[in-house]
Structures are given as structure tokens and as C-alpha cells.
Regions:
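Second-shell loop/turn segments in exported
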Residues: 23-32, 68-74, 137-144
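Hydrophobic, aromatic-enriched interface-forming segments
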Residues: 38-44, 48-72, 76
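Structural recognition of the beta-strand scaffold that forms the well-ordered cores
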Residues: 1-5, 12, 53-58, 95-98, ...
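A structural motif corresponding to the C-terminal end of an alpha-helix
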Residues: 40-53, 83-97, 159
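Oxyanion-hole/transition-state-stabilizing segment in secreted/luminal serine hydrolases
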Residues: 1-30, 59-63
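Extracytoplasmic/secreted proteins, especially bacterial periplasmic and envelope-associated proteins
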Residues: 26-29, 33-40, 44, 75, ...
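Histidine-centered active-site loop/cap adjacent to the catalytic His
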Residues: 121-174
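Substrate-gating cap/lid alpha-helix
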Residues: 62-101
Length: 174
């Protein structure tokens, strides 16, 4: 059993490079390069272990709770996940594990569930500290915290349980 988490740093690199002109189009070239890199990673992994189930985790939008109105970011994450899934599906014993919804929205945070929320009415309402994603580390509101990792683990385990019969071989017992 092999788990792989890739892609998040690639996305952040594009965001930092294009912070003032960020668009969905900014990610097209980097996504293609990422897909090439992911293909190489999976090929190398498969050369070392031809039978193991490989579970590749998707990425999540850490900005969703505080900025649900930035729809382009959600589109970018969805496109990135689709690009990942496209590569993963080329290997019959590799599986894509989506985590965007469970991390971005899975804790029941009000802002995450209400995407039609009106613009903040006061300076206080716009304070990033007023809304928190309970699945992210409080110090950076970016990386998963214990709750976030538990949610991710649950998604991975659901995928393993659903697919293990395709790659898990029972040892001959004598």
C-alpha cells in the first residue's frame, strides 16, 4: 500500500508567481508539467513495486472558508484534481482520493456551507480570524490540523476498503 500526496506546492508556486493576475488560465501550463511529473513518480513507484495499491490524494482549497466568493480558486482546484485523476486512472491499481470537499467544507463551517453569503457588512466581519476552517492548522489556516488529517485518513480508508480486493493478495497459509 502506497499513499502519495502531491500537487499542493505546485499550485502555491503558481499563486505566488501570479498573485496579482491570477486566473484559471494561469494554471494550464503548470498543470501539464505537474501531470508529467506525476506520471514519472507513478512509473518510478511502479518499477519498485508492481503490485501495490497506490492512492494519490487530491488537493484542497484552503481559502474556501474565508473566501467562498472566489469561485476561480475552486475551479482551479477542481481542474487540478481532474488532471491528477486523469494520470492516476492510467494505472489499474492506482486510485485517486478526492479530499477537497471534506477539507474545504467537511467540518460544517458556516461560510463553507453558505456560498451565497452576502459580502461582509463591516470591517469586523471581514477579519480572517472571525471564520476558521476547523480542519486547518490555526497558525497558518493552510495545512491540515489533527481534525483535517483525521478527515483525510477517513477518505483514504474508504477508498482502500472499496478497492483493496483488486490488489491485496492473501499469502498462502499452511
Amino acid at each position: 500500500l502506497i499513499t502519495v500526496t502531491v500537487g499542493g506546492n505546485d499550485i502555491m508556486k503558481v499563486i505566488k508567481k501570479n498573485i496579482f493576475g491570477l486566473s484559471v488560465d494561469s494554471f494550464e501550463g503548470p498543470l501539464e508539467k505537474y501531470q508529467e511529473n506525476l506520471s514519472e513518480i507513478l512509473e518510478e513507484t511502479r518499477s519498485l513495486n508492481s503490485d501495490a495499491g497506490i492512492y494519490v490524494l487530491g488537493v484542497y482549497n484552503p481559502f474556501y472558508v474565508n473566501f467562498p466568493e472566489i469561485e476561480d480558486m475552486q475551479t482551479i482546484i477542481q481542474n487540478w484534481d481532474e488532471g491528477t485523476k486523469e494520470i492516476v486512472e492510467k494505472d489499474e491499481n492506482a486510485y485517486f482520493v478526492p479530499i477537497n470537499e471534506v477539507i474545504s467544507q467537511g467540518t460544517g463551517d458556516e461560510a463553507a456551507l453558505n456560498t451565497n453569503k452576502e459580502s461582509p457588512s463591516s470591517e469586523e466581519d471581514n477579519d480572517l480570524n472571525t471564520v476558521k476552517n476547523k480542519a486547518l492548522y490555526e497558525e497558518d489556516n493552510f495545512h491540515p490540523n489533527t481534525t483535517g488529517y483525521q478527515l483525510i485518513t477517513r477518505e483514504v480508508m474508504k477508498n482502500i476498503d472499496a478497492t483493496k480486493d483488486t490488489w491485496l493478495k492473501e499469502e498462502n497459509a499452511s
